[in-house]
Amino acid sequence: MDCAYERRTPPTEKECLALMYENKVDEHIIAHCQAVAKMVQIILLELSCTNVLLDEDALLSAALLHDIARKEKNHADVGALKLKAMGYVAIGTMIATHMDIEVNVNAPLNENELLFLTDKLVSEDEACGFEKRFEKAFLKCEGNLEAQKNIMKRLNATKMIIKKIENLTGKVFHYG
């Protein structure tokens, strides 16, 4: 019998940290997740003057937990399944798309897109420009055309999400 609830209150920051320790997540991965959550807060503050509706608590919890399965193959899917099994369906859904996402430019900005983006604006536990992050990824995968194709897809998704934010705020995006 599946005991997951359709909707649970998102875990607090303290509860997220406890879940990370319970899942034996390394300190440097926890620090990365905390930096992503800080970036989420910065962008949410910028978006507060817009009419975009987001589940901010769930998004912050997803940021803190997005790499809960980082050491496992297909960590986004594995992490998503873990959170969904605990009853955090919305958070699991966000985590599932933090590595790869399909962006609909005609749809409103959503939590999945913000989690994807903020993860790309943080390297280790430091904010960085997405261009720098993707440049490093391209160099790392030099000669691997399939990997470079996937990186280019992620770069394009990042740019589309940034454009959505710029359209909402009327400002040039300058984070990371």
Question: What is each model feature region?
Answer:
Residues 1-74, 126:
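Acidic/His-rich, divalent-metal-binding segments that scaffold phosphate/diphosphate chemistry
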Residues 49-141:
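Divalent metal-dependent catalytic cores for phosphoryl transfer on phosphate-bearing substrates
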Residues 146-176:
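Charged phosphate-binding loop/patch that engages nucleotide di/tri-phosphates or the phosphate backbone
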Residues 25, 29, 75, 107, ...:
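Residue-level recognition of alpha-helical structural elements
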Residues 19, 43-46, 82, 161, ...:
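Residues within well-ordered alpha helices
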Residues 12, 16, 75, 110, ...:
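Alpha-helical structural motif
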Residues 6-20, 67, 82-94, 146-153:
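Short, charge-rich amphipathic segments
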Residues 30, 34-37, 56-60, 92-99, ...:
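Short, well-structured alpha-helical segments
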